[in-house]
């Protein structure tokens, strides 16, 4: 991995091959739920809205200890040519500011709840609101959020709850990875993240360590079927494991497919402490993973899309979930010699955590529920053709050429040896005949 080589140049200025497919959930029974005739909200998936994730690597420097330090920045750009849906369409969605703040204050004193209820009534805040798709993704604010961010900035550090805005607002981090020849199995795994050997999300080092984590742009060389890969995505707030599933053929090359286990977000089976749980909180049901430290402490959990592999009791809190393992699970296809991912898909759903909010009359019907907000799919659709050609030559053509050349050299060597032996025998035979002819010449004495 050196400057000037194709692999380095491709990584330093990566082609924009990652598509972000956004799916949002529209509440279709707004009136029935609000008047109490129906007890569960019905959600309809709307999407995809397709963006291209632009990745920039800057401030790149090679370190003397065999590591590489760089700053990675990501942003999402709307792709008009790939979209058939309008960002101006209207949605009925949960009022994230109201529900999130009441959930945050669920354990507050009576006086705090009373004061908050007065503010909510004065502002005529409703638990469900109508909003455009664009504003829901990028510019989701209201008078309650603006008021709270000014009055208690430590509790409400943002004044915009647009879901993509929250994901990409601070997506710029310094990463140090191993690249030296002595770090083959740790190639492009993290050594430091923002100058530390931990992410800073969790108190337990087991969950917070950067060791073996990778951003998924490159994996180590000579990947084996026994290897467990470690994928880190900032908005997931944790490292997730990938395990070998099967061999495949991709772009004419033999590849390995690694998958994300469906029980990744389950609680430990041995009953040990779940270090992805916030202090003072109870563990979430199986299939849910705490991500609020990565969303400004906003009460959020991640799951697989449509509550795939989530505790059925959680899925039954809302109507409209249609989990599909083939559509909603994640994988990465890797060329094992180089560790280069040729294709990958990863799906993640963000869900609002509403705790016991019985003390807040406008939202008490949402108490103790997990409300799906959106799910997104990250899809690396391939790699540039010049890189495909180079890889194909290295992993397919060159080994075969080497085999043919080796065989030709063996044949040539054997032929030369045979010719040499033949010539030697021929000379030896001529010499014997010469001596015999001398013996038959009559003596002149």
Residue ranges and their predicted role:
Residues 1-254, 260-445:
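Extracellular or lumenal secretory-pathway regions
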């Amino acid at each position: 991995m050196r400057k000037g080589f194709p692999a380095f140049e491709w990584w330093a200025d990566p082609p924009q091959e990652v598509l972000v497919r956004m799916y949002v959930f529209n509440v279709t029974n707004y009136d029935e739920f609000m008047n109490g005739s129906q007890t569960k909200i019905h959600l309809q998936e709307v999407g995809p809205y397709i963006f291209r994730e632009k990745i920039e690597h800057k401030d790149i420097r090679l370190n003397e200890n065999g590591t590489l330090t760089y700053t990675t920045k990501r942003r999402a750009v709307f792709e008009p040519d790939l979209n058939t849906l309008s960002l101006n369409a209207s949605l009925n969605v949960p009022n994230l500011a109201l529900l999130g703040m009441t959930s945050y204050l669920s354990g507050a004193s009576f006086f705090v709840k009373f004061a908050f209820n007065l503010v909510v009534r004065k502002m005529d805040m409703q638990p469900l609101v109508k909003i455009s798709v664009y504003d829901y993704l990028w510019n989701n604010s209201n008078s309650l959020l603006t008021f709270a961010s000014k009055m208690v900035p430590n509790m409400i550090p943002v004044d915009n709850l647009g879901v993509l805005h929250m994901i990409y607002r601070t997506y710029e981090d310094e990463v140090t990875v191993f690249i030296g020849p002595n770090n083959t199995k740790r190639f492009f795994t993290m050594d430091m993240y923002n100058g530390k050997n931990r992410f800073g999300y969790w108190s337990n080092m087991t969950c917070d360590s950067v060791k073996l984590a990778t951003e998924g742009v490159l994996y180590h060389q000579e990947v084996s079927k026994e290897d467990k890969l470690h994928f880190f995505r900032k908005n997931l707030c944790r490292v997730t494991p990938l395990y070998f599933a099967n061999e495949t053929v991709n772009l004419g090359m033999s590849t390995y497919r690694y998958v994300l286990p469906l029980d990744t977000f389950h609680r430990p089976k041995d009953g040990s402490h779940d270090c992805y749980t916030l202090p003072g909180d109870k563990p979430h049901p199986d299939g849910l993973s705490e991500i609020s430290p990565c969303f400004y402490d906003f009460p959020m959990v991640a799951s697989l899309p449509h509550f795939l592999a989530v505790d059925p009791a959680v899925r039954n809190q809302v109507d409209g979930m249609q989990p599909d393992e083939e559509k909603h699970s994640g994988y990465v296809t890797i060329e094992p010699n180089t560790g280069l991912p040729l294709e990958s898909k990863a799906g993640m759903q963000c869900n609002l955590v509403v705790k016991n909010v019985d003390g807040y009359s406008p939202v008490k019907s949402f108490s103790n529920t997990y409300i799906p907000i959106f799910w997104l799919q990250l899809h690396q659709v391939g790699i540039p053709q010049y890189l495909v050609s180079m890889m194909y030559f290295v992993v397919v053509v060159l080994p075969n050429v080497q085999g043919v050349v080796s065989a030709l050299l063996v044949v040539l060597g054997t032929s030369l040896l045979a010719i040499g032996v033949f010539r030697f025998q021929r000379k030896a035979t001529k010499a014997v005949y010469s001596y015999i002819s001398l013996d038959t010449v009559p003596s002149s004495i």
